Structure formats: structure tokens, C-alpha cells
């Protein structure tokens, strides 16, 4: 690729940390899937809306706290993932932190994605989550190709975020449609 070793090292470091940042979102998703499935099975549909509101609220608080921590301590944390020294290490850390800062600001979008997708799955719908996954793929790929032409290497940082947004644009209206038609 044309991004260079320093860029790839920084990008990779942030992606390693991203896996950790997503852990709470994944856990909230597992919880809401079980909660929703149990309430669908019991015919207590009104509880699904309450659970979803609580899940979104907890997700927003968590994602904003994580974002603040990453903006404050991100460079220090990223330095644990970057082994290069000298100018290469400084350059990789600069790339990594820029990507982390951008990603952190938009972390609530990812958390909404996990909670909403999982709630829909708990309601028994597997098609909307699959379609949203396809939207993520095409948004990520399209953004990576287009935005790098427009913004250079910084364009790649927005591919993940716009992939999340693309999925949310399918999942959020889908949730409301399903919830209205559930009972």
C-alpha cells in the first residue's frame, strides 16, 4: 500500500486498542439480546422499549467516558502498542493518536450500533442485522477508497466511523419499525 510503514504502525496500534474500546459495547449487546429475547418470549413487549432506552443510556455514558479517557490518556496507552523508537516511533504515535481521537469522538455511534443490532436480533430478526453488516462493509470500503482520494491518509480514519453510521441508518429505523409491529 502507499501509506508507508509509520502510518501502518500507528493505524495498527489504534486498531488493537479499538478492540478493547469495543468490549463494553459488545457486552451491552449480549445483555440486550438476552433481555429482549426473554421479553418477546414472555409477551412483555413494553419492557423491550424500556430495556432499549436503558441500554442506550448506559451505552452513551460508557462511550462518552471512554472517549474522554482516550482523549486524555490515549497517547500514553497507545505507546504500549508501539515498539518503534526515535522518529519512527514519534510518527507512528502521532498517526495512532490522531486516529484514536477521531474514533473516540464518534464512539457513541458504535455503541448505538451494538445495542440496536442486538435488540433486533433478540426480537428474532436476523435479516436487518445482516443487511446492516453489508452496509458496514460497503461504507467502510467505499469510504476508504473515496476519502483517501479526497483527504489523503486521513481519509482512512473515517472509514470505520462511516461504516458504523451506515449500519445505524438501517438499524435504528428498523428497530422502531419492528417495535411498532411487535405488539
Question: What are these model-derived regions, one by one?
Answer:
Residues 7, 32, 95, 115-116, ...:
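Hydrophobic alpha-helical segments typical of transmembrane helices
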Residues 10-68, 72-74, 110-132:
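Small-residue-rich hydrophobic transmembrane alpha-helices
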Residues 36-105, 147-183:
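Short alpha-helical transmembrane segments in multi-pass integral membrane proteins
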Residues 1-19, 88-95, 125, 158:
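Interfacial/gating helices of multi-pass transporter permease domains
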Residues 26-29, 103-122, 128-140, 156-172:
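Short runs within selected transmembrane alpha-helices of multi-pass transporters and secretion channels
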